[in-house]
């Protein structure tokens, strides 16, 4: 799940691009078809753009969504059908791992496209705009440090539990006491990662700032290298905590799903069916891929 921490605002772009369409809202297609507008609003929070620049950015985002709709969404439908079939005899660790690995690989492909979009578009901005962008990242860093570093252990574990309950109940409905206990018991084994995550983010933001301030013509390649090497520069404690928490997360999901009631099972299958239907509708309504805008 290394894609959960992305550079240059890409994490939230990725969330908009993939997870927003899985957010459980009543209309997946409605949200997906308006992602260009939503992403545009988000980018304007980081840098001031002219009308021509906004139009250029929207064109690039449209091309990204065309690619995602044509080449990625069909696989989502297959995975969801396979996942539903695996529920019949009780979900196994191997089956859950397969789905999670598929999603991570898909997220990595989208992450690469988002990174290309941001760097290529960034190359069209002025030096002043790029500095404005990185200063906003630094402001975000300060807010993240204030939010997470002051959090107590009790608050941290409570947040973890609430997030799991919220995400799982969205697909299952009200959780049973046994399911809630499974979440509470296993999430208590989590190793705090927020301190390490904030430190890791601060490191690459500082590296990016140095590159952008120098304004070297090769800054796009340097920025890309910062991202691609970010994992190599992480402290071993970060990687160990991340791996541990990933295992625990999968244990929680497996335990809760396999304790589902017949009512929860019906709801889960109904939700899976809705996503498959929505994804198929999006695929059918897709536009031809703009390969020039994607840089292909």
What name fits each language-model region?
Residues 118-238:
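Extended amphipathic alpha-helical interaction segments
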Residues 26-29:
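Bacterial signal peptide processing site
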Residues 43, 56-57, 114-125, 133, ...:
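Short, structured motif recognition centered on aromatic/hydrophobic residues
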Residues 2-14:
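Bacterial N-terminal signal peptides that target proteins for export
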Residues 21-24:
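C-terminal motif of bacterial Sec signal peptides marking the signal peptidase cleavage site
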């Amino acid at each position: 799940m290394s894609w959960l921490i992305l550079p240059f605002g890409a994490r939230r772009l990725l969330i908009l691009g993939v997870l927003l369409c899985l957010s459980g809202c009543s209309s997946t297609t409605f949200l997906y078809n308006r992602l260009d507008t939503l992403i545009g609003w988000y980018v304007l929070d980081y840098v001031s753009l002219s009308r021509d620049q906004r139009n250029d950015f929207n064109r690039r985002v449209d091309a990204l969504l065309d690619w995602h709709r044509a080449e990625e969404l069909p696989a989502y439908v297959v995975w969801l059908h396979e996942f539903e079939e695996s529920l019949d005899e009780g979900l196994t660790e191997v089956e859950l791992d397969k789905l999670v690995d598929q999603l991570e690989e898909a997220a990595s492909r989208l992450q690469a496209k988002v990174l290309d979009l941001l760097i290529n578009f960034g190359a069209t901005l002025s030096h002043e705009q790029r500095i404005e962008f990185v200063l906003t990242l630094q402001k975000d860093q300060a807010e993240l440090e204030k939010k997470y570093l002051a959090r107590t252990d009790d608050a941290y574990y409570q947040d973890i539990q609430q997030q799991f309950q919220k995400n799982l109940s969205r697909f299952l409905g009200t959780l049973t006491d046994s399911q809630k206990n499974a979440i509470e018991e296993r999430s208590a084994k989590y190793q705090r990662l927020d301190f390490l995550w904030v430190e890791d983010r601060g490191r690459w933001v500082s590296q990016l700032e140095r590159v952008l301030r120098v304004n070297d013509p090769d800054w796009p390649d340097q920025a890309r290298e910062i991202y691609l090497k970010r994992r190599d520069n992480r402290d071993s404690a970060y990687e160990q905590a991340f791996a541990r928490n990933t295992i625990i997360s999968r244990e929680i999901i497996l335990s809760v799903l396999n304790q589902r009631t017949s009512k929860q099972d019906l709801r889960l299958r109904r939700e899976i069916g809705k996503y498959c239907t929505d994804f198929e509708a999006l695929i059918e309504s897709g536009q031809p891929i703009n390969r020039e805008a994607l840089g292909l």
